[in-house]
């Protein structure tokens, strides 16, 4: 399955919520009618079956993190193998992706932009360039912007916006150095309550 590169509003309307695909700090334009399905004359949403609700939640989470279907299934399989809550394990794996950590540290204003920075070798982990967006960052890892990329306007602007909104508690960021430390994968209580990972567990348990 190819990565979706079409209108972000269309995806948000399909899921009925802002997925923050355009920016975590700016809400979608008011013209994006989240209560209607995609299309010029998007119909109001009908009642979904239990399966439909579970599928929509799985798609919503997958799209928030920008993960392809096969990758998402692999993350779920790994979450099952680990001790503890499968749903929470899944979110920790997604939050530990390098592109997501770069986004959380404010080096990219969206996860898509952060993924591009990683792919273009603009990000360093523990002193080594890493260009794999799915790379799993570990507690204590230091993530920084490569020296030659520090003057990129999108990074400077993204970091300024992130500073205004504040950084998540599970990362510490030195904005002047454009460097941050991944303290640990976040606890469930630190993440958005708009996500219901248990529905994903139920979806794959059928």
Swiss-Prot record:
<dbReference type="InterPro" id="IPR036986">
    <property type="entry name" value="S4_RNA-bd_sf"/>
</dbReference>
<feature type="domain" description="S4 RNA-binding">
    <location>
        <begin position="96"/>
        <end position="159"/>
    </location>
</feature>
<dbReference type="GO" id="GO:0015935">
    <property type="term" value="C:small ribosomal subunit"/>
</dbReference>
<comment type="function">
    <text>With S5 and S12 plays an important role in translational accuracy.</text>
</comment>
<dbReference type="InterPro" id="IPR002942">
    <property type="entry name" value="S4_RNA-bd"/>
</dbReference>
<dbReference type="GO" id="GO:0019843">
    <property type="term" value="F:rRNA binding"/>
</dbReference>
<dbReference type="InterPro" id="IPR022801">
    <property type="entry name" value="Ribosomal_uS4"/>
</dbReference>
<protein>
    <recommendedName>
        <fullName>Small ribosomal subunit protein uS4</fullName>
    </recommendedName>
</protein>
<dbReference type="Pfam" id="PF00163">
    <property type="entry name" value="Ribosomal_S4"/>
</dbReference>
<keyword id="KW-0694">RNA-binding</keyword>
<keyword id="KW-0687">Ribonucleoprotein</keyword>
<keyword id="KW-0699">rRNA-binding</keyword>
<dbReference type="GO" id="GO:0003735">
    <property type="term" value="F:structural constituent of ribosome"/>
</dbReference>
<dbReference type="GO" id="GO:0042274">
    <property type="term" value="P:ribosomal small subunit biogenesis"/>
</dbReference>
<comment type="similarity">
    <text>Belongs to the universal ribosomal protein uS4 family.</text>
</comment>
<comment type="subunit">
    <text>Part of the 30S ribosomal subunit. Contacts protein S5. The interaction surface between S4 and S5 is involved in control of translational fidelity.</text>
</comment>
<dbReference type="InterPro" id="IPR005709">
    <property type="entry name" value="Ribosomal_uS4_bac-type"/>
</dbReference>
<comment type="function">
    <text>One of the primary rRNA binding proteins, it binds directly to 16S rRNA where it nucleates assembly of the body of the 30S subunit.</text>
</comment>
<dbReference type="GO" id="GO:0006412">
    <property type="term" value="P:translation"/>
</dbReference>
<keyword id="KW-0689">Ribosomal protein</keyword>
<dbReference type="InterPro" id="IPR001912">
    <property type="entry name" value="Ribosomal_uS4_N"/>
</dbReference>
<dbReference type="Pfam" id="PF01479">
    <property type="entry name" value="S4"/>
</dbReference>
<dbReference type="InterPro" id="IPR018079">
    <property type="entry name" value="Ribosomal_uS4_CS"/>
</dbReference>
